[in-house]
Amino acid sequence: HRDLHLSLRRQRQMCIRDRYCEMLKRDKKRFENNLELLDECPLGSAALSGTSYKIDRTYTAKKLGFKKPTDNSIDSVSDRDFAIDFLYASAVCAMHLSRLAEDFIILNSDAYQLISFNDKMLTGSSIMPQKKNPDPAELIRGRTGINYGKLNSILTIPLTLNLTIND
């Protein structure tokens, strides 16, 4: 839906038609960049400063499908930037999806009635049977904060071994 244009609002008033694809393209690029950074094999890094076994790390990296072995064994086992990068990309993507979901909810509302959802995507209200709730969009909005929390959690874990990473 690269050419999907929606009516955008400022102060709850319609003002311009624009696309959402640019922010989602950036999100895709963030995930692609993250995958590229993960294309290094940590095998042989051991618990701290490498292994005493005579292994050819370049050979094993290639055999396992990695571009190359990691450059630094301490960095391989103690840094969490790979997880931070992924969680950051997830949080930004969630923010954009939340923004899009919010706009869909508003544009679907009785006040605007500019878009409509398929009935399969709606649920009825427990007290108002005529009311239809766009639950998927609401769930996207509601889950965004969880992504922020996970990013914040990993940012505050100290270097090297810390068992709270399992939470």
PLM feature spans:
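Single conserved hydrophobic/aromatic residue that forms the stacking wall/gate
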Residues: H1-R12, I16
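Internal glycine-rich alpha/beta core junctions
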Residues: R17-T160
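Short, solvent-exposed helix-loop connector elements
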Residues: L163-D167
